[in-house]
Amino acid sequence: MTNMKNKFGNKLIGAHVSAAGGVDQAPLRAREIGANAFALFTKNQRQWVAKPLEAKTISAFKANCKMLGFGAEHILPHDSYLINLGAPEAEKLDKSRAAFIDEMERCNQLGLTLLNFHPGSHLKKVSEQECLATIAESINLAHKTVPDVVAVIENTAGQGTNLGWKFEHLAEIIEQVEDKDRVGVCIDTCHTFTAGYDLRTKEDCERTFAEFDRIVGMHYLRAMHLNDSKVEFASKVDRHHSLGKGEIGWDCFEYIAKDSRFDGIPLILETIDPDIWQQEINTLRQFHLAAINNQ
């Protein structure tokens, strides 16, 4: 672990890698692109139910992580896209809660302590406040069922009826979660930008993260998704782009790489061209190491 830190500095930078062939393959794929962090799905993200993780797969995952120096703090599992923890219909809500608890249990089996998820949608059937309260209740139920795993709420772009695009939404959910030590936030730069929080310049970043700190609190930031945006500012549309090639530009990502407030948490690429992930990781790391050397 020490060697890894010396080589990579204090930034945990990686990408959302494939778990095809088994979750134990994900850490190997992360290392292939020079990552010291990674995200993965622990099951097929487009299915409600998956077969349980096999003991040999769990052992192989843990062994590969240990061999490559990945600790739980380096890894950000993502739940299924089907789950809506704020679903207004009882049947869909029950199904979503059961699936979310299963995702948490899988994380626990793998020795992982973070679970990243999209908060939920009101589908124009209940108020925003009711939906946010339902999301918080869903988190509380999962916490009571599964120990240790932190529920990491991802901010959204605000497409359709998705909640979580306003920092106030995140704060309102957290306020109603009983175990504050087991809830956090993952800020996606593309979602933040298209939701209406500017990130194009260093000054914009200062303002946006000051607002996040005031409304939610930087101490709740447990991970980030680093994505540029194909679509314009405040468009409420979620379309990722490669770093520096979209509407946000490199200044934002240089800012994050150089700012120590973003040290020690997974910084995960979900950019559109896996062929250049290694290049993107290297550029971010160069920014970070340059900042350290200039201290």
Curated annotation (Swiss-Prot):
Zn(2+) 3 binds at residues 191, 238, 240. GO terms for biological process: base-excision repair. Zn(2+) 1 binds at residues 78, 118, 154. Binds 3 Zn(2+) ions. The gene is nfo. It holds the Pfam family AP_endonuc_2. It catalyses: Endonucleolytic cleavage to 5'-phosphooligonucleotide end-products. This is Probable endonuclease 4. Endonuclease IV plays a role in DNA repair. It cleaves phosphodiester bonds at apurinic or apyrimidinic (AP) sites, generating a 3'-hydroxyl group and a 5'-terminal sugar phosphate. Belongs to the AP endonuclease 2 family. The keyword Cytoplasm does not apply. Keywords: DNA damage, DNA repair, Endonuclease, Hydrolase, Metal-binding, Nuclease, Zinc. Its cofactor is Zn(2+).
